[in-house]
Every structure is written in C-alpha cells, then in structure tokens.
Amino acid sequence: MAVAASIAVEERSVQARMASPSRFGDKAFEWLTLAMALAVVVLIILIGWQLWIGSSVAIKRFGFRFLVTSTWDPVAEQFGALPFIYGTLVSSLIALLIAVPLSIATAAYLTELAPLWIRQPLVSLIEMLAAIPSVILGLWGIFVMIPWLRDYPFPWLKRLFGWTPFFSGPIYGPSMLAGGIIIAVMILPIITSVSREILRSVPDLQREAAYGLGATRWEATRIAVLSYAKKGLFGAVILGLGRALGETMAVTMVIGNTPQIAASLFKPGYTLASVLANEFTEATTDMYLQALFEIGLVLFGITILVNLLAQLLLRTIATTSATRAVQ
C-alpha cells in the first residue's frame, strides 16, 4: 500500500510540474512550430490565389479550352496550353525512365556493395553534381551533349526503333529526348542521395535474416532491403518528379522551344516552365500576360496534383503492406 501511495504521489507531482508556469517555454515552442507549419500552408494558398487573380480574365475568356487547344498566337490573342503540358509531362517521363533505375542502382551499390575506399568519393561526386547550376548544365547540353546525341545515339535509335512513331522522322539536335536527358542528369543526384539515406535506414536485422536463410548478397539486397524500403524509394522518385516538372533553365536551352505535339522524341518541344522563362518579358498585352499567369497556374496545379497522388499511393502501399503483415 505504501508503494502504491508513493507512486500516486509521484504521478501527481509530475502532472503538477507539467501544468506549472515553468512549462511556458514548452507551450511557446509548441505554438511557434504550429505557426511555422501553418505559415507554409498559408504561403501555398497565397501563391495559388495570386496566380488565380493574375489569370482570371484569361480563365473567363478561354475556360477549359485553354487546357485542350494547341494554338499559341500572341498576335491574335489565341492561347492554348496543351503543347506545353504535353512537353512537360513527356520530358519528365523520359527523365524518370532514365534517372530512376540509375539512381536506385547507384544507391544500392553505395549502401550494400561498395567498399569504403570508393564509397565516399562517389558520394562526394554525386553531391557535387547536384550543386552544379542548371545554366551550366544547359551550356554543357548545348555544346557537348546535343552534338554527341545527334551524331551517335540518335541515329542508332532511329535504325533500331525507327519503325515506331517515337523514333521516326528527321533527327534534330534540340529535342524532347534531349530535354528529358538533361532533366535526368539534374534529378539523378537528388533521387540517389535520398534513396541512399532510405536504404541506410533499413534495419540490419532484415539483411541478417536474409543471409540466415541462405540468400546471396543480391537476393538479400533485392528481397530484404529494396522490398523493405519501397515506400521510401517511391517518395524519393516523387521528389525527383517534382524537380523535373519545374526545371526551367537547362531544359529551355536544349528542348527546342517549339509549341507542338509530336509523337517523335527527335522533334523539338516546349514545357510550361520554359514558356514562362522565355515569354514573360515579351508579354506586351494584358491578355498575353494573363495567359502566361494561367500557364503558371497550370504548372502549380500539376505539381500539387502529383504530390497529392503520391501521398495517396504511399498510403495505399502502407495499408497493403500492413495487411500482408497481419495475414
């Protein structure tokens, strides 16, 4: 009884201390962090509101047609965003198809296979690649990457896959494929770095259990490590996609900046971010400026939608994994 009474007295003492004025600092910190979190939400809302206000006249005039028409004629004040939406999505998809396998493979090698003497230099090089300004990568793309692609890989791709609409037609230097490749170079270090940290966080118990069952290193990496970390890896891919959708300078310098919808990846294209960078200073009429604001609103909406879909998919994956674990 004496022990129980002592415990009860101690619990009341702890509760009293937590409710005392000395805990004002904790409450202040809680409210401060809450205010910072809400400030982020308010900032996003204000950005969307400003884009909506800036494009309200264009929205009323063109309506839904703005998203599904391909005419972009500032002189006649006829505007449609479809070529830019198409160019943004296709170039981002190309970038993901190239960067995701390379990034995850690199992260797995650095985490599971690379000896210590080579691991740190490779990590440093990847971090340096992420620090290169996009305009520098754009210059490299113009003077090094595009001539090389035009002379070697593009003709090879046309010989092998020219029977498909994706690699048919004449070969241009600046093109959708070149834009996708330069974006892949830019998002590769981001996805690699995040994926590496995710794989490093996998418990050693996962690996030891796989080895205990007789798995090889490759089998342990594939079954125990990559499978365990798939939710986090998907998040890393979405982070790279967010960067790909908004990339501006480098892709503007290599994609060709032609508002068209073409199946061939050898043809020039245009992205939402590129048209904003190229034409915002040239908008000499109110409607032209309104249309560019609506382009910004579309890009903003696509980015928000992609992130919301990613969160939904992550929750679905987590729910499925939990259900399988229970079964």
Predicted regions, residues:
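Membrane-interfacial helix termini and adjacent extracytoplasmic/periplasmic loops
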Residues: 60-79, 139-185
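Periplasmic/extracellular loop-to-transmembrane helix junction in inner-membrane transport proteins
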Residues: 13-27, 31-32, 51-95, 115-116, ...
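Transmembrane alpha-helices
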Residues: 125-128, 132, 136, 191-198, ...
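Interhelical loop and adjacent transmembrane-helix boundary motif
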Residues: 251-301
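C-terminal transmembrane helix and the adjacent membrane-cytosol boundary/short C-terminal tail
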Residues: 196-200, 204, 211, 281-327
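Transmembrane-helix boundary motif in ABC transporter permease subunits
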Residues: 95-126, 310-319
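Hydrophobic alpha-helical transmembrane segments of multipass integral membrane proteins
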Residues: 86, 90-98, 102, 106, ...
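Transmembrane alpha-helical segments of polytopic membrane transport and secretion proteins
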Residues: 1-36, 310-327
